[in-house]
Amino acid sequence: MKSLNRQTVSRFKKLSVPAAIMMILSTIISGIGTFLHYKEELMPSACANGWIQYDKHCYLDTNIKMSTDNAVYQCRKLRARLPRPDTRHLRVLFSIFYKDYWVSLKKTNDKWLDINNDKDIDISKLTNFKQLNSTTDAEACYIYKSGKLVKTVCKSTQSVLCVKKFYK
């Protein structure tokens, strides 16, 4: 095998430096392009378009009025739920959207339920417990209206706000 002389080796060294630089630049540029192409998958935003972010939750005004059953179904389709009656965000939501909206509280045969999951709710922990406890109706659903929970007929149509946690 024939060995290369010093001049040939020197030429290879001179040519390999620009080639290496071009390869490095090409790798960096393609990496940036790949990142920009897959940006949504790599770094998802906290809330999707149309949802409003507040305190680790995303809120959506559906701009639809419907009954509680349909409201729960609509929020589930969006992988969300109706706002809970015990959340401190109710007043903030009212000030943002400025409308009455369903909350996930329902009274059925002296049982208080979260209509998102049909689990029992201890209403003694709610701020307007005395007002709620005085309800004598066999069935009642609730909306948040001007700073308080207000009883209404479950089949009536009210505004629907959906809520979900970040990255869900």
Swiss-Prot record:
Keywords: Disulfide bond, Glycoprotein, Host Golgi apparatus, Membrane, Signal-anchor, Transmembrane, Transmembrane helix, Virion. The lineage of its organism: Viruses, Varidnaviria, Bamfordvirae, Nucleocytoviricota, Pokkesviricetes. Residues 54-163 form the C-type lectin domain. The chain crosses the membrane at residues 15-37. Gene3D superfamilies: Mannose-Binding Protein A, subunit A. It comes from the Viruses. The gene is OPG162. It comes from Vaccinia virus (strain Western Reserve) (VACV). Disulfide bonds join C75-C162, C141-C154. Belongs to the orthopoxvirus OPG162 protein family. This is Protein OPG162.
